[in-house]
Amino acid sequence: MSNIDNLTSRIIKDAEDKKRIILSEAEEKKSKIIAKKQEKAASEEKIIIEKAETEAVAREERIISSAELQARNEKLKSKQTVISKVFETTIEELCNASSDDFKGFVKTVILNSTLAGDENLILNEQGKKMIDSDFVAELNREIGSKGNITLSDKTGNFKGGFILEKNGIEINNTFEALVSSLKDEMGLEVARVLFS
């Protein structure tokens, strides 16, 4: 019986030893798997954090860029408003010219133009108060032999200046048209003077 006890004891001891080895190997595998998973999780966490930081920086740059663009556009819009106001003020000042200054303007433009001499002079309501048939007669005398400009009965719908019309063709010398043509040419110069 002692052999059986020894054999049983040895089998139990061998089983215990195998159990310890198996449990030790399982614990080692478990530790390796956990360490590997923790390493992978840390690596993925690092990648996710780096990606989030990169996206945050890119988003911040986009927001700043958008804000700068919007500010630049608002500034440009304000400058364009100021420039437009300058040209509108110029038209108003021309419209408020004295009768003598307005007559001088009409005379200078007509005498320096290449005309047939028989055009109709179209004025707005204010212009009709300043220019009369005596002025037109004097103008025709200065033009010379081809001078036959007539004062039109038609009242122009414009702020100031005048229109010369013949056979449906108009030469537009209104202040609005003259300032508008200068606006394209002088817009940059006006901006330079105003905003430098």
Curated annotation (Swiss-Prot):
- Record-level GO cellular component terms: proton-transporting two-sector ATPase complex, catalytic domain
The keyword Membrane is assigned to this record: no
Going by the UniProt record, its keywords in alphabetical order are: ATP synthesis, Hydrogen ion transport, Ion transport, Transport
* Signal peptide annotation: none
The answer on whether this UniProt entry bears the keyword Transport reads: yes
Single Gene Ontology BP annotation: proton motive force-driven plasma membrane ATP synthesis
Q: Which GO terms describe its molecular function?
A: ATP binding; proton-transporting ATP synthase activity, rotational mechanism; proton-transporting ATPase activity, rotational mechanism
Question: What is stated as this protein's family in its record?
Answer: Belongs to the V-ATPase E subunit family.
Known role: Produces ATP from ADP in the presence of a proton gradient across the membrane.
Please report the name of this protein according to its UniProt entry. Answer: V-type proton ATPase subunit E
Q: Can you name the source organism?
A: Clostridium botulinum (strain Alaska E43 / Type E3)
